[in-house]
């Protein structure tokens, strides 16, 4: 409804139905083989210029971590959601958001293997090598490209895998840990800027407070605790001890490697398990040392993103290859080769509206499965 001239307007009893100048007709005759079809929407991001080495890293290094970690989280969340309608209401959006990319990574890997994307890329790279070798100027610019890509990605594989475990099992899964991470960031700021203490009402505490209040609106302690326990076990099993920092190894040894007991202790002795506890604890000024006496804050501060970034940088320095920079060179080279061949090209669909069109037809999603009748 809008105003008398058909323009958008606030609610009024005098509003009238808006009649658009043009409309799309919706067919009610069903969908049949050979029908024209069109899809329009935002694809998020695509990576159509990835090298075979970059595809291999995604398929064999990062996607397996994402799939396993998120599947473990989802299984725990679903069990709690099925047992309690209130938890289902609180966690439905979280569950969808986590499962969305978990399913994406799972089916991406299935399709990468099914269509042998690494093999397709490698075959194109063989053509690229011949194209580079055919011209002295291209040899001078790109002669070491493919060898550098292989060396660079192989050198950084373990550092990338560990960083992915850090992202998927440490900083993201638990709301309590996310609150603790914010306290860790607060401690870093206090130490950097010479802030003696922080309490509720200070501008330095405002971000922690507002983010915790927003996050804890949809929070179940038992669910979060079980998720954190499982994710911490996964982190400890897959990330070497030298990446844990100082406080986490001390707590882990104190509880003799019993992660559930460690998490029980941390949850019982932290201010991060509720908005009310957080505000009550910061009702009086807290020094950086006092904040780090909180076991959750201590663990969050112990495992630093900087350590993972430094390990990745060290891998690059040891190999003498920055894989990301080589990937950019590869993008230029493959684009130039395709252009010289007259191959039509288009940019990656990064946050742009894209149109896909064609005709309806059968599909074979898996071996020995053939679907000829369109889904209605």
Task: Give residue ranges: language-model regions.
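Short, surface-exposed secondary-structure boundary micro-motifs
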Residues: 41-43, 360
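Cationic-aromatic interfacial patches
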Residues: 58-283
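Short, Lys/Arg- and Gly-enriched loop/turn segments at beta-strand edges
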Residues: 44-54
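Short, structured beta-strand/loop micro-motifs enriched in basic residues and often containing a Trp
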Residues: 13-22, 355
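Residue-level detector of conserved catalytic or cofactor/ligand-binding positions
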Residues: 369-375
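Short, well-ordered loop/turn sites that connect or cap secondary structure elements
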Residues: 30-31
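N-terminal activation segment of mature serine protease catalytic domains
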Residues: 207-210, 214-367
């Amino acid at each position: 409804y809008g105003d008398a001239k058909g323009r958008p307007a606030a609610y009024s009893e005098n509003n009238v139905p808006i009649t658009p100048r043009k409309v799309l007709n919706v067919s009610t005759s069903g969908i049949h083989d050979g029908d024209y079809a069109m899809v329009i929407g935002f694809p998020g991001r695509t990576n159509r210029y990835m090298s075979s080495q970059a595809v291999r890293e995604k398929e064999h290094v990062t996607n397996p971590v994402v799939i396993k970690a998120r599947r473990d989280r989802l299984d725990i969340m679903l069990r709690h959601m099925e047992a309690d309608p209130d938890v289902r209401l609180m966690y439905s959006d979280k569950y969808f958001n986590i499962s969305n990319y978990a399913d994406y990574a799972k089916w991406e890997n299935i399709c990468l293997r099914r269509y042998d994307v690494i093999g397709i890329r490698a075959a194109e790279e063989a053509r690229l090598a011949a194209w580079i070798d055919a011209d002295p100027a291209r040899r001078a610019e790109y002669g070491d490209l493919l060898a550098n890509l292989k060396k660079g990605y192989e050198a950084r594989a373990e550092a990338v895998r560990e960083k992915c475990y850090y992202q998927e099992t440490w900083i993201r899964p638990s709301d309590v840990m996310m609150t603790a991470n914010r306290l860790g960031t607060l401690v870093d700021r206090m130490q950097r800027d010479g802030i003696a203490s922080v309490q509720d009402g200070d501008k330095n505490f405002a971000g922690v407070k507002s983010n915790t209040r927003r996050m804890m609106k949809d929070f179940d302690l038992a669910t979060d605790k079980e998720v954190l326990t499982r994710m911490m076990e996964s982190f400890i099993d897959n990330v070497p001890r030298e990446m844990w920092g100082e406080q986490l190894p001390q707590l882990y040894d104190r509880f003799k490697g019993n992660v559930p007991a460690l998490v029980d202790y941390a949850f019982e002795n932290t201010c991060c398990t509720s908005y009310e506890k957080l505000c009550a604890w910061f009702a009086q000024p807290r020094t950086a040392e006092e904040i780090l006496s909180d076991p959750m804050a201590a663990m969050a501060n112990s495992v630093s993103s900087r350590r993972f970034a430094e390990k990745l940088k060290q891998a690059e320095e040891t190999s003498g290859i920055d894989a990301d920079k080589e990937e950019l060179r590869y993008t230029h080279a493959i684009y130039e080769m395709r252009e010289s061949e007259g191959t039509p090209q288009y940019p990656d669909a990064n946050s742009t509206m894209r149109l896909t069109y064609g005709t309806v037809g059968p599909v074979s999603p898996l071996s020995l499965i053939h679907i000829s009748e369109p889904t209605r």
